[in-house]
């Protein structure tokens, strides 16, 4: 237990109400989540202040601001309050104190970037587990402790939930933590009070401009993982993917605070200038080959101040961007373990078998074309997936179809951009619903479709158009079926946007929906229809 007096000392807060002798055993940001004996972190809401619900919670004390304190003071039974200017700024350090600073007992890796966080974290988790270590994972697809799933919601949980999870991981024997760190989490202070031994940056492309007013603001939010000057929590080692100007800028920022490992994933047409060997190592992909089965065989050169070495490994996932993800993963593993990796290391060998739900996930039902589900829901990710498919398909005449939507109540500007990219790189675009949330679905579809039509016109001007199909199919299951019906032998179909998700959020209601299941159903129905046609043709032939 921790006294509220001690917590007030940590955050420099003012104590009000009957605080003497009060101790807390847990913390929560949701009033309904407060356990008996817990601290309620009451923050201002969009409509009402969280402190309004303090009296109905199990809280024995409240961390809040001046506005929240006034609400609690006027309640029939006032609770002890720790009053601070910014509750979110102090939730992390206070929660860490309550739970005994569990992160100090873990080797921690934090991964940020627009795309690739989930795949990279999966790769790191598998490699560490195969090396005989106990590992906790927190990210978009959920939380796991030593491979066992633990229900969570946000990519990066709120600080009280996060610290409770870390304490549970330590209690269950975990020694290492692999964690996705979103820009929201950094901006809202969810990881304050948590030191990362290794912090990694994958890439930056347009997304979340509903939350960040500009790309520069988005970049600066990501950079907080490496600066974090407000609480002296800079990472021990920074791993930076330097494939463009964003990566180069992040490398320069990180180098001011941490030992920095620069990564260069592009094997050709490099836009990033590779520095000469210095005291900081640089990892560069020197070769990448795709086998007939789709497995990628990758060669890496690692250079330092006085020497260089080579590393060869395989991954079972398609896409040039997964080459980059694997490079980030290996650099993180070497940094956190202190082991000099070789091609024979268990951690390196482990990457060959990793499959990530909803990330370039192949769905096979005996069809003669490629069918996959991917989480791509932002312009950069859509471009990366479609470009990778062009490189992946053996027949240059093979066609690519994409089912595409966009989330409601999110960045509006990216919708036509996604549509345009899809039409420029694919041969068929089936515009449909993603998670409309509280928006009118047709408005979202029309924005994507407008961009797609722009892409088609651009291809026609360049005389590149092969009669691109561009259709609006509102029902997502029907759109998936339409794409499957369109595909011919040797083609590829990708269902983009929802990936691992198991539901579709429409007007505040979550409806069961799984892209992988729907794609499998559509493939089965196509196979059945084909079988029935063959049966009728055979029957007709016999009658003649």
Sequence positions of predicted segments:
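N-terminal leader/targeting and accessory segments in enzymes
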Residues: 1-93, 97, 314, 318-320, ...
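Phosphate-binding loop of NTP-binding sites
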Residues: 8, 90-259, 330, 536
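Short glycine-rich anion-binding loops that position phosphate/pyrophosphate groups of nucleotides
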Residues: 45-47, 183-184, 206-207, 244-245, ...
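Active-site beta-alpha connecting loops in nucleotide-dependent enzymes
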Residues: 45-48, 356, 380, 388-460, ...
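Receiver (REC) domain switch/active-site residues of two-component response regulators
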Residues: 60, 197, 427
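Acidic, Mg2+-coordinating active-site environments of NTP-dependent enzymes
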Residues: 68-77, 198-371, 456-466, 470
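Short acidic-hydrophobic, aromatic-tinged amphipathic segments that line or gate anion-handling sites
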Residues: 81-86, 471-474, 479
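Short, flexible loop segments at boundaries between secondary-structure elements
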Residues: 209, 511-544
């Amino acid at each position: 237990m921790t006294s509220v007096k001690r917590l007030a000392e940590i955050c420099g807060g003012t104590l009000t109400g009957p605080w003497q002798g009060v101790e807390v055993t847990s913390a929560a940001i949701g009033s309904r989540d407060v356990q008996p004996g817990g601290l309620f972190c009451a923050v201002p809401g969009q409509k009402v202040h969280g402190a309004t619900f303090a009296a109905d919670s199990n809280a024995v004390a409240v961390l809040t601001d001046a506005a929240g304190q006034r609400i609690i003071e006027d309640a029939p039974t006032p609770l002890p309050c720790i009053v601070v200017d910014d509750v979110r700024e102090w939730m992390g350090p206070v929660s860490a104190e309550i739970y005994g600073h569990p992160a100090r007992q873990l080797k921690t890796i934090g991964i940020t970037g627009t795309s690739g966080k989930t795949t990279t974290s999966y790769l790191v988790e598998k490699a560490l587990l195969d090396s005989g270590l106990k590992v906790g994972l927190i990210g978009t697809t959920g939380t796991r402790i030593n491979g066992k799933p633990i229900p969570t919601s946000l990519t990066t949980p709120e600080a009280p939930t996060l610290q409770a999870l870390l304490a549970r991981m330590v209690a269950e024997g975990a020694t290492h933590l692999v964690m996705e760190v979103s820009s929201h989490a950094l901006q809202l202070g969810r990881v304050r009070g948590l030191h990362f031994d290794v912090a990694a940056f994958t890439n930056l492309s347009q997304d979340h401009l509903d939350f960040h007013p500009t790309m520069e603001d988005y970049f600066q939010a990501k950079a907080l993982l490496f600066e974090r000057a407000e609480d002296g929590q800079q990472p021990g080692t920074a791993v930076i993917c330097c494939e463009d100007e964003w990566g180069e800028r992040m490398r320069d920022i990180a180098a001011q605070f941490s030992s920095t490992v620069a990564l260069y994933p592009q094997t050709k047409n490099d836009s990033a200038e590779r520095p000469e060997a210095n005291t900081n190592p640089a990892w560069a992909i020197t070769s990448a080959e795709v086998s007939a089965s789709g497995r990628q065989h990758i060669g890496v050169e690692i250079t330092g101040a006085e020497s260089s070495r080579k590393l060869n490994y395989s991954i079972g996932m398609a896409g040039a961007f997964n080459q980059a993800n694997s490079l980030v993963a290996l650099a993180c593993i070497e940094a956190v373990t202190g082991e000099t990796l070789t091609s024979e290391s268990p951690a390196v060998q482990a990457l060959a078998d990793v499959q990530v739900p909803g990330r370039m996930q192949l769905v096979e039902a005996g069809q003669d074309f490629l069918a996959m589900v991917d989480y791509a829901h932002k312009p950069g990710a859509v471009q990366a997936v479609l470009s990778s498919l062009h490189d992946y398909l053996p027949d240059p005449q093979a066609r690519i179809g994409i089912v595409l939507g966009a989330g409601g109540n999110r960045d509006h500007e990216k919708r036509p951009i996604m549509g345009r990219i899809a039409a420029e790189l694919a041969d068929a675009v089936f515009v449909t619903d993603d998670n409309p949330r509280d928006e009118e679905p047709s408005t979202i579809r029309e924005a994507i479709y407008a961009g797609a039509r722009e892409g088609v016109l651009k291809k026609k001007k360049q005389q590149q158009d092969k009669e691109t199909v561009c259709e609006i199919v509102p029902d997502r299951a029907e759109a998936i079926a339409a794409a499957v019906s369109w595909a011919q032998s040797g083609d590829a179909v990708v269902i983009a946007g929802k990936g691992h998700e198991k539901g579709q959020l429409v007007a505040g209601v979550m409806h069961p929906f799984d892209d992988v299941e729907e794609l499998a159903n559509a493939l089965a129905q196509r196979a059945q229809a084909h079988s029935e046609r063959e049966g009728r043709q055979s029957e007709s032939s016999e009658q003649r």
